[in-house]
């Protein structure tokens, strides 16, 4: 059975209950918003939307970091992972928030320092702070992908 939500990018739409994620602590800077829908833009698109079900104007573009950084390994203490019911990062769906500048989409960046990990079974997620010093709040996606490919 679907749930109707209002979204910033697509207007009103139906989502399944399995698309609704709980963030008991909210996201960094948006702690008051606890429920988000994970919405695919288009089947062939790598981008997804993390849309607040509580505030229509709150939506983030997200992607799996492995798409542009194959060896992405956030450094997060195991004790923190237990907070969402996982023991290892590989047990989660890992996403990073993308910022796309309107004037030049080729300069889009990803917050690899603040990964969002989601327990695939319980659909409970949290935005963590990676202790890996090579991770950045604004990692250039196309540059990182080019370095990995070339």
UniProtKB/Swiss-Prot annotation:
InterPro entries: Flagellar_assembly_factor_FliW, Flagellar_assmbl_FliW_dom_sf
Keyword S-adenosyl-L-methionine: no
Compartments where located: Cytoplasm
Pfam family, one: FliW
GO biological process, one term: bacterial-type flagellum assembly
Major location category of this protein: cytoplasm
Presence of keyword Chaperone: yes
Gene Ontology CC: cytoplasm
Keywords noted in UniProt: Bacterial flagellum biogenesis, Chaperone, Cytoplasm, Translation regulation
Main function: Acts as an anti-CsrA protein, binds CsrA and prevents it from repressing translation of its target genes, one of which is flagellin. Binds to flagellin and participates in the assembly of the flagellum.
Subunit structure: Interacts with translational regulator CsrA and flagellin(s).
Family of the protein in this entry: Belongs to the FliW family.
NCBIfam families from the UniProt entry: PRK13285.1-1
Protein name (database record): Flagellar assembly factor FliW
Species, as recorded: Leptospira interrogans serogroup Icterohaemorrhagiae serovar Lai (strain 56601)
């Amino acid at each position: 059975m679907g749930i109707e939500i209002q979204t910033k990018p697509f207007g009103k739409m139906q989502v399944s209950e399995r698309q609704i994620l709980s963030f008991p602590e909210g996201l960094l800077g948006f702690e008051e918003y606890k429920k988000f829908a994970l919405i695919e833009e288009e089947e062939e698109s790598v981008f997804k939307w993390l849309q607040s079900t509580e505030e229509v104007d709150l939506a983030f573009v997200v992607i799996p970091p492995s798409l542009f950084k194959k060896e992405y390994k956030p450094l997060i203490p195991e004790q923190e992972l237990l907070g969402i019911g996982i023991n290892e990062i590989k047990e989660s769906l890992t996403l990073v928030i993308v910022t796309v500048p309107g004037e030049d989409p080729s300069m889009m960046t990803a917050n690899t320092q603040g990964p969002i990990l989601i327990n695939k079974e319980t659909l409970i997620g949290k935005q963590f702070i990676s202790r890996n010093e090579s991770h950045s709040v604004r990692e250039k996606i196309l540059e990182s992908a080019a370095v990995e490919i070339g």
